[in-house]
Regions:
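Membrane-interfacial amphipathic/re-entrant helices at transmembrane-helix boundaries
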Residues: 2-3, 10-80
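Single transmembrane alpha-helix segments in multi-pass membrane proteins
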Residues: 42-46, 56-116, 134, 138-153, ...
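Transmembrane helix-bundle core of multi-pass membrane transporters
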Residues: 65, 155-226, 279, 333, ...
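Transmembrane alpha-helical segments in multi-pass inner-membrane proteins
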Residues: 259-265, 271-339
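Cytosolic-side transmembrane-helix boundaries in multi-pass membrane proteins
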Residues: 1-31, 44, 238, 245-252, ...
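Short loop segments and helix-boundary regions at transmembrane helix junctions
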Residues: 17-25, 89-97, 121-188, 226, ...
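Short, non-helical or kinked segments that cap or interrupt transmembrane helices
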Residues: 47-52, 89-106, 149-158, 232, ...
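Helix-loop-helix "hairpin" substructures at the membrane interface of multi-pass membrane proteins
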Residues: 202-279, 303-304
Length: 367
């Protein structure tokens, strides 16, 4: 007798849009499960009470005034990169080159500090740094955008490859500008004169990045939701054919949007070199160009929601680092914990978008 195909036990069905409080509840549950698993793993590994683990997570982010400021500064940097990527992502231009665009902006800022530091007044040097960083980041975004607009090249590959070029450029100039010679690093730039160092706000070196992040968040929200350019980005993202039909010049939108995206990444490079580290290295972006992709995607390209996503990721990352330090574990262990947390955060998005529909009753097998 011919066998009848059995129905699957469940189907994956796309949900209607969930209310915000249900989405928030699913994310909260995912974080809770991630924390429980991190606590269990750490307890098994070290024999330490899980409550001490959770206490370390909080103390890692907010254990002192300095740690609190550093946490918010890191949130601001991650948020700025995510905001820079969002216009391109909303247009379905997959810009994976934020890391390189940040490095390009940082390298341009460092070049101004080193080459102009003893030739021009401080205010003029800072102005040159701002222009150079924005221009360098914009150029780094323009190149893959131009090839995409003209020849429809794969933007994921081209933006990714631009990261390697930027990294090697920074590595090259690190040797050219190294101090002292043979050290393999530039060191603190203009440490004696502070020329090119971005000004502090109310005497705090942390506030500038935070203020810039607040301003750019508001700007990006208005730009994407209430401007003609933001509307064009949305239409191109939905359908290029529709955009062309209604008279939108798709190539122009692609290039303009990537110029903006790259320039904002260049601004982050300026803040890192001129305001935070006062030097440039190949690792100055700290991989946040890739983490920002997750922040933007998790937030459904909503600039306001990105504030909370950035806070969550930085809070967990700083907490994981504190665990590895307090309990005598190496930094790789904190990376493991951060990976577990990010895995749960990403996984919960599946349950926000889809649901499992189980079969009501099993089919009787025919003999």
């Amino acid at each position: 007798m011919k066998e009848k195909n059995k129905e699957p036990l469940f189907h994956i069905v796309k949900r209607d849009a969930l209310p915000w409080y249900k989405s928030l509840g699913i994310r909260f549950l995912a974080i809770l499960l991630a924390l429980i698993l991190c606590g269990i793993i750490t307890t098994i590994t070290t024999g330490i009470n899980p409550l001490q683990v959770y206490q370390s997570i909080v103390l890692g982010a907010f254990g002192s005034v300095r740690k609190t400021w550093v946490t918010f500064q890191n949130i601001a940097i991650l948020l700025l990169i995510a905001l820079a990527l969002t216009p391109a992502f909303k247009m379905k231009f997959w810009n994976i080159g934020a890391e390189g665009q940040v490095l390009a902006g940082g390298l341009a800022a460092a070049a101004c500090m080193i080459c102009l530091g003893d030739k021009l007044p401080n205010a003029v040097v800072i102005l040159c740094m701002i222009v150079a960083s924005l221009a360098a980041g914009a150029i780094w975004g323009f190149i893959p955008a131009f090839f995409k607009a003209k020849w429809n090249t794969n933007e994921t590959l081209s933006t990714l490859m631009m990261n390697y070029i930027a990294t090697q450029l920074v590595a090259f100039y690190t040797i050219v500008w190294e101090v002292p010679k043979g050290s393999g690093k530039i060191g603190i730039i203009n440490q004696n004169t502070n020329v090119g160092w971005l000004p502090q706000i109310f005497g705090s070196k942390y506030l500038l990045s935070i203020v810039v992040a607040v301003v750019i968040t508001i700007f990006m929200y208005v730009y994407l939701n209430y401007s003609k350019q933001g509307y064009e980005i949305s239409v191109v993202g939905e359908s290029e054919n529709t955009a062309k039909y209604v008279g939108i010049k798709v190539e122009k939108v692609i290039i303009r949007t990537m110029l903006l995206s790259g320039a904002l990444c260049g601004l982050v490079g300026l803040l890192l070199v001129g305001g935070i580290n006062h030097t440039v290295t190949t690792t100055i972006a700290g991989g946040q160009g890739f983490t920002a992709v997750l922040v933007s995607w998790m937030s459904k390209f909503n600039p306001l929601t990105m504030v909370f996503s950035s806070f969550l990721i930085i809070f967990m990352d700083r907490g994981a680092s504190e665990i590895s330090t307090n309990f005598g574990l190496n930094h790789s262990y904190s990376d493991i914990l951060t990976g577990i947390i990010l895995f749960f955060i990403i996984g919960c998005e599946f349950f926000i978008t889809y649901r499992l529909q189980f079969r009501k009753k099993a089919e009787k097998e025919e003999q």
